From Swiss-Prot:
Gene3D superfamilies: HAD superfamily/HAD-like (3.40.50.1000). InterPro entries: DUF705, HAD-like_sf, HAD_sf, HAD_SF_ppase_IIIC. It holds the Pfam family DUF705. This is Uncharacterized 36.0 kDa protein. SUPFAM superfamilies: HAD-like.
Length: 313
């Protein structure tokens, strides 16, 4: 079911792109005068408040867009970007002492309002990237005991995505040792900016992390000890939430991105991604990767055509 949303854009925000999500317009009073400029966008569901409409009509610092969208992050992000003709958004934030409780926030990485000025600056050569998250087993590599690459074309195609400025993340539900061994066997480690393993089921407590002596892996490997904002019973299967990926990118100083894509053989792992590319399982090597690369590239081209070509300068 679609909801009616209001999104305000601060014309002279100090920190561009970040979105503050409120439960109601009156909650702006909790922000504090100095923090107004932390957020270019303020988003909330509309309840027909005359106070809200009247206040915005007389406030020259903000421009207002109203739209109808489902209460999910893909739809909300799409409508905000379309309404304000922007291809890039920053972090989604909530008030620490009165956080909004919309469904779209359930599995999206959110910051509290006071954390925005504490964010690390971008330290790598990524300028508003597309993010592509890859599964490992039966997606990039075979299911054989002695693993092989699915298709030698993968090496050139991952390089192509990197050359286009994409951030590449590997997320496998295999053990850390399995992931490290498999990546070494097929020489894929250098292609990824971050590597995540384990975390396929809900646990009552985080699993112990195993250290690795592989220095190349250490520079990219990220612990999977994340908490999920979902009511999953212990042992329940979990999707590959963008929340984890966005947190990792923030830790690396990447606070803005265009789209986020999941490439995986299991549709159940898809949760709130902008794009999902479903690949056929590969128990043994196949020479079929180019079709998936073309789908990834077509999605990115579609995105840039939809948002970037219409962006507000």
């Amino acid at each position: 079911m679609k909801c009616k949303w209001a999104c305000l854009r601060l014309r002279d925000a100090f920190y561009k792109g970040h979105v503050l999500v409120l439960a109601e317009y009156a909650d702006l009073k909790y922000l504090g005068f100095q923090k107004y400029e932390y957020f270019e966008y303020v988003l909330l569901q509309l309840n027909g408040s005359a106070q809200f409409c009247g206040a915005m009509a007389t406030n020259p610092r903000y421009c207002l867009q109203v739209f109808s969208a489902a209460d999910d992050m893909c739809s909300v992000r799409h409508h905000v970007k379309t309404a304000f003709k922007t291809p890039v958004l920053g972090h989604v934030c909530v008030l620490q002492h009165k956080p909004a409780m919309y469904a779209c926030l359930k599995e999206w990485y959110t910051l509290f309002e006071f954390q925005v000025p504490l964010l690390r600056s971008q330290s790598l050569v990524w300028e508003f990237p597309h993010v592509v998250v890859f599964d490992l087993d039966s997606t990039l590599i075979t299911e054989q005991e002695d693993v092989q690459i699915r298709d030698p074309q993968i090496y050139d195609d991952l390089s192509e995505l990197r050359d286009l400025g994409c951030v590449l993340v590997l997320w496998s539900y295999g053990s850390r040792d399995h992931v490290a061994h498999s990546l070494r066997a097929v020489q894929l480690t250098p292609y990824f900016d971050a590597i995540i393993s384990e975390g396929s089921v809900a646990e009552d407590a985080p699993a112990a992390t195993t250290e690795t002596t592989d220095l190349q892996m250490q520079s990219r490997y990220v612990s999977s000890n994340f908490s999920f904002d979902m009511h999953a019973e212990s042992g329940a299967e979990l999707p590959k939430s963008p929340k984890v990926v966005i947190k990792i990118l923030a830790d690396k100083g990447v606070n803005y991105f265009k789209s986020i894509t999941l490439v995986d053989d299991l549709p159940s792992n898809n949760f709130a991604y902008d794009y999902y590319v479903r690949v056929k399982r590969c128990p043994v090597p196949l020479r079929d990767w180019r079709r998936y690369q073309d789908e990834i590239l077509d999605n990115l081209a579609e995105y840039d055509s939809l948002y970037v070509s219409n962006k507000t300068i």
